[in-house]
Amino acid sequence: MVTSIDGKVTGEFLSRPECEAATEIYYEMNREYKAQGSGGFICGRVTMEGSFTGGWYPDLSEYKTVEKCLGHYMNCWFDDVADANYFAIAFDPKGKLGWKSNIIEDSDPGYGGAMIIEVLTEQVDPRYLAYLEEKEISYFFAGETEIDVPLALKILRDHLAPEFYVLEGGSIINGHFLRADCVDEISLVQAPVTADKDSKSLFMDGDIFDFELTETEKKNGALVMRYTRPKEE
């Protein structure tokens, strides 16, 4: 995550020129994680909307209701996607993201070509499922009203067997993962700027966990830090 000096991860500070170098380092790290075997990146609804869908949403009145089968709808179209071993996993509890394709279209190789998977709750409109199926977008359910993070990760692990995933925010989903004790490593790129009062912290509603600082590097005016959870005795 790119952070301000005071530990914020989203806000107006990210658009300042002081953040340009830190942001580019962040993208470089994402590409490195992909090369090291990452199964893809995980983001919450707001981050996916801001980065990829732009707020577009389908007219669900055009779709028939699909019965909510609480099993999995993991599609079989992987052979048609060149980068099908890499996924964009959207934690979208109520199904509010509007995708125009089943892959991420982005010029950055750390994102472009990733096959989209929607992680939903039972609160989703059944017509949204019909829309996803029309777009050949994989989805599965992982909770009634809130996404059960350990359950979602188990389903992904059982179906895709990744080395690891990269969690890329925002603040709300970061907090969910931390509280569920599902954060093994934290990589931060601290930009030389502070944030305003409306900016969001790294972990919203987080909890106390111990980490070990394993790496620090000053790079292009930013500070790169890596933390890992202590190994259990």
Write out the residue ranges for each language-model feature.
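Enzymes that bind and transform nitrogen-containing heteroaromatic metabolites
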Residues: 1-233
